[in-house]
Amino acid sequence: MTLSAWIILVTLAMASVLTPEDNVRLRRLTAYVANADASIVLLTYTEYEEGTNHGNSMLWRINDPLEAEYPFDPDDISLLNAERVCPELVGVGDLQYSTHNQAFYFTAQGPDGTSQVYSYNHKLETCTQISFLPISVSNLKVSPKGNSVLFSAEIFVYPNNHASVDDPLNFAHDEFARIQARPYKAFAYEQLYTRHWDEDILPSQYRHLFAARLERSSEYDDDYVRITVDNSIDLMPRFDGDCPMRPFADASSYTFDSHGRYVAFVTQVGSTAAFYTNDSIWITDLQQFLDAKKPVRDVVLPLRCATCWNKARDQRPAFSYDGIFLYYASMDEEQSESDLLRLRKQNVSDLFEYDCDSLFCGPVTGEGVFNLTAGVFDRSIGQFIIPTDSTEDSIYILAEDHARTNLFRYNEESSTVTRLTYNGTLGSLLYLRHNKIFLATMSSYTRPTDLVMLDLTVATEFTATRDPSDTMKDDLIKISYLTDLNRQRLRHIDELQEPEEFYLPSKSFPDQYVHSWYFAPANLRDSHEYPLILYVHGGPESPWANSWSYRWNPQLIAARGYGVLATNFHGSSSFGEVFQKSVRGNWYSYPLEDIMDAWSNIYTHADKAYLSREKVCAMGASFGATFMNYMNSHVNNVTCYVTHDGVFDTMCNALETDELFFPVRELGGFLLDEQVDNQQLYEKWNPARFVENMSAPMLVIHGQKDYRIQVYHGISLFQALRLRGIKTKLVYFPTQSHWVWQPQESLFWHTQVFDWLDTYL
């Protein structure tokens, strides 16, 4: 038995530590919504059946959560005053509340297996199906007046087939059935994408945004609202584009104005989304649709493009309360997914005065556009909320900051930004206007996602600086937990350790600091030596953030008796624009320098004398795996590697990857531009070019459904190592994508990784 194996056995025997089995059993909060005063909260969470990949999405109701006291009774189900709602429904999501209608709305699987719209009457405690559409719908959003809804659906757009435009929902139902019944499975493509992330996209298949009226009809004996094809309309007819954009955009891609008349939505037209990031915001006027007699699908609505003047990405549209201004998050760089998103404001009151027939009708320049956060906020804008009742001129923003996602207040009058939170990662803000309170989701390295309340009435002032020594370490508003979903599932765990974090001065950039997290091995024993794991994140423009992970969770590695060093090297987001963009064209130079510096420094910590200098393994996924493939040929004192879904050949990947724009920004231009310097940069950072220098054992992991980095990269790397006599193993997932997301597959992943680490460390 090796020393490392003995340490692991002792570690597991001494105390109950987090295991992969524990992690996949956790309840995963997926959505929530509250009524106006938060006296009722509906939420859904998913938990997986033991030994399967089948997850159940359950709907719960919490009464008066703001009046509860924390901590909770350990004998309850870790939900305050909670009760299960409509347990017969499965696949629940897209939770909405209409103040006007005093009703909740959501999507769930209907009797025919499609996802349909339901309403929940909280007084009668009944759920009622209200949409009867031929295909599934998702990304539900209810208008402020409660008289209409928005939803998305997968349809087909054939330019020469009028039925696909005139009756898109019924046509899509029939077309999916026709394709399924064909005796062959082949397709012919003329447009990009052919596939995206892990999805095979059919020719001419698009995700379109629809509006439907919420109205009661005298055609039926009951008093139920019904959504049908007769009162639904495609808001982007003939568009060869998606809304929400694939693969991860959601209902934040569109919004109503405060009166429910105008809708702003994000899409990209022209089948160029694989090579360009020109996602723009269109606005349409629903008035004719709301006034028309049924059927309404023949109504032609006016469309104007508010931001087609900007050739970069625009996201998250939101109207001012008076409807005069459109706020949105926007990038400046074309063909970029990692530019900072800045908050912009644009007058759209005269948008429909533009008289033109072009689909792109609208402003042709950015004249009159206000760049609100440019020059005053060196972070990328995430979700933002404009309180309609605020006496202050404030906008509340979620943004990545110092490896967290924090809440900020932006004062439009003074152009100042105040950080309000610091601990953990926030998401899914919901503003309760009468209470000056936010609800939000929150997680950290020590706690899976729960629902929290953010009380703005106790906020104090703090303005952040770039100097990490001045970084605020405490929240400036009161944060209270409203749920503790996994108390029972984690109660046997002795401790989830709070990681140490430290900054080191950058060797290449004066006045910059490089941040690292460190997780100590669980159950440390005096006089024992423990191996070290170098944890390398993907992106490269993303950080190791203080949030819970169901996949690459450093707590699981530390629980096995390994120290874990996770460095946020140059390129990591949340540390400012200059720091983030420095990785472009420098894929391994600055990151390797930062990682090596943190690695060397960790041994100078007097309290870490237990760390081995000889037993060190490096592991990473995506860009982190690409980094592993390069590092193995350039660093000779790493014992072993784990590389998950990484690029082996940058030249091939430039034309294989689904998002063709990605290497354009990262590596200085498109591979086929015939720029000699550009091609040399692709070759400079090409791991395949240095394969003859690889020597350390390498565990290669790849998913067949990974369309970001094709499976051939993993197979090629594995075969190259084998042919060179280097110890290696290929772990192949036929059903997984860029991520291993199914619980049983994840357990197998962890078994293989732990076996590899235990063998070589």
UniProtKB/Swiss-Prot annotation:
InterPro entries: AB_hydrolase_fold (IPR029058), Peptidase_S9_cat (IPR001375)
KW Cytoplasm (keyword) present: no
GO MF term list: aminopeptidase activity; serine-type endopeptidase activity
Protein induction: Expression increased in response to the protease inhibitor bestatin.
Active-site residues per Swiss-Prot or TrEMBL entry: 622, 706, 738
Listed EC numbers: 3.4.14.-
Signal peptide: 1-15
Pfam families, per database record: Peptidase_S9 (PF00326)
Compartments, record wording: Membrane
Keywords assigned by UniProt, alphabetized: Aminopeptidase, Hydrolase, Membrane, Protease, Signal
GO biological process, any: proteolysis
A Gene Ontology term for the protein's cellular component: membrane
Broad class of where this protein is predominantly found: membrane
Domain of life: Eukaryota
Family of the protein in this entry: Belongs to the peptidase S9C family.
Physiological role: May be involved in metabolism of dipeptides or may affect host defense mechanisms.
Name the record gives this protein: Dipeptidyl-peptidase 4
Organism: Giardia intestinalis
